[in-house]
């Protein structure tokens, strides 16, 4: 994948996350600074999503672990545990928010 393709895909994903949070989860604060998107919860925990441009990956840090996602076909898949990005993000945000959060 070329750098411009990577940036288009990751920018679209970051926008999707922001739009989903803004539309349905007023208790989650979403802030983007450059290649980092931070989701902050009322209990002071965070989920941090960031671009890893040299590797063409998306990294996610949760309260429980760190994950490295690579594009496989149409999905971002964690290269260690095999989790799909939206599924993992839904689970992590649900755990940290203490209420159901979905990224369909």
From Swiss-Prot:
InterPro entries to which the protein is assigned, alphabetical: CyaY, Frataxin/CyaY, Frataxin/CyaY_sf, Frataxin_CS
CDD domains given in the database record: Frataxin (cd00503)
Domain of life: Bacteria
One GO biological process term: iron-sulfur cluster assembly
GO molecular function per UniProt: ferric iron binding; ferrous iron binding
Entry-linked SMART domains: Frataxin_Cyay
Family matches, as Pfam families: Frataxin_Cyay
Entries under SUPFAM superfamilies matching the protein: Frataxin/Nqo15-like
Keywords, ordered alphabetically: Iron, Metal-binding
GO cellular component: cytosol
PANTHER family on file: FRATAXIN, FRATAXIN, MITOCHONDRIAL
Record-stated family: Belongs to the frataxin family.
Biological role: Involved in iron-sulfur (Fe-S) cluster assembly. May act as a regulator of Fe-S biogenesis.
UniProt-recorded name of the protein: Iron-sulfur cluster assembly protein CyaY
Organism, scientific name: Aeromonas hydrophila subsp. hydrophila (strain ATCC 7966 / DSM 30187 / BCRC 13018 / CCUG 14551 / JCM 1027 / KCTC 2358 / NCIMB 9240 / NCTC 8049)
Gene from which the chain derives: cyaY
């Amino acid at each position: 994948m070329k750098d411009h393709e990577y940036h288009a895909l990751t920018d679209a994903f970051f926008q999707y996350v922001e739009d989903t949070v803004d539309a349905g989860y007023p208790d989650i604060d979403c802030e983007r600074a450059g290649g980092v998107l931070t989701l902050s919860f009322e209990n002071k925990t965070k989920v941090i999503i960031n671009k890893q441009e040299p590797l063409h990956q998306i990294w996610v840090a949760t309260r429980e672990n760190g994950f490295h996602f690579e594009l496989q076909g149409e999905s971002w898949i964690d290269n260690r545990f095999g989790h799909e990005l939206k599924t993992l993000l839904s689970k992590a945000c649900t755990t940290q928010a203490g209420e159901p959060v979905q990224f369909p």
